Amino acid sequence: MTTSTPALAVTQANGSFETISLERRDLRDDDILIDIKFAGICHSDIHTVRQEWGDITFPITPGHEIAGIVAAVGDGVTKYKVGDRVGVGCMVDSCGECENCKNDHEQFCTKPAVFTYNSLNYDGERAQGGYSQQIVVTERFACRIPDSL
């Protein structure tokens, strides 16, 4: 089942943020659902919502500096369990099958890679970022945050 989550989105270039509801995809075998606790603001978020780096599809929920707690895991997830603290950067998926992906160079994925926002997921839906309460990412695009931090 898809997950509905509140999010902040911009609906037009140079517009203000508005609260919307996002539908996050169903968990695939290698996905994790993250309850977002923190999302940083990067200048790239500002450039994007102002359309200074090219056209975007509105509404858009930016945010690619994400920290949170794993809330659910897909059946094939091996790196994380519910309750783990994780971070997410600017990518959330790649094909995982091309030579670049197999050699840990997902940013050069031949399919191409899926960025955290303003990118198409492989299911054809537009990726939306971390200015929301939850996000679904492929487990290999999360990184563990040590309890000591």
Model-derived features: where do they sit?
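A near-ubiquitous, low-amplitude feature marking generic local secondary-structure context
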Residues: 5, 19, 53, 81-84, ...
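Glycine-rich beta-strand-centered segment in the early N-terminal region that forms part
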Residues: 25-39, 52-102, 107, 128, ...
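Short N-terminal strand-loop motif that marks the start
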Residues: 1-67, 133-137
